[in-house]
Amino acid sequence: GILDTLKNLAISAAKGAAQGLVNKASCKLSGQC
């Protein structure tokens, strides 16, 4: 239903944000930003 769809969207957004933070951190650590 709609609640499941919203929950999945929220999970996807959270995963995307986390991935972005990880990418930013790793590029800073490796000095490749």
Swiss-Prot record:
GO terms classed as biological process: defense response to bacterium; killing of cells of another organism
Annotated tissue distribution: Expressed by the skin glands.
Domain of life according to the entry: Eukaryota
Chief place where the protein resides: secreted
SS bond list: C27-C33
Keyword Transport: no
Localization of this protein: Secreted
InterPro entries: Antimicrobial_frog_2 (IPR012521)
GO cellular component: extracellular region
Key words of the record: Amphibian defense peptide, Antibiotic, Antimicrobial, Cytolysis, Disulfide bond, Hemolysis, Secreted
Transmembrane segments annotated in the record for this chain: none
Primary role: Shows antibacterial activity against representative Gram-negative and Gram-positive bacterial species, and hemolytic activity.
Sequence similarity: Belongs to the frog skin active peptide (FSAP) family. Brevinin subfamily.
Name of this chain's protein: Brevinin-2Ea
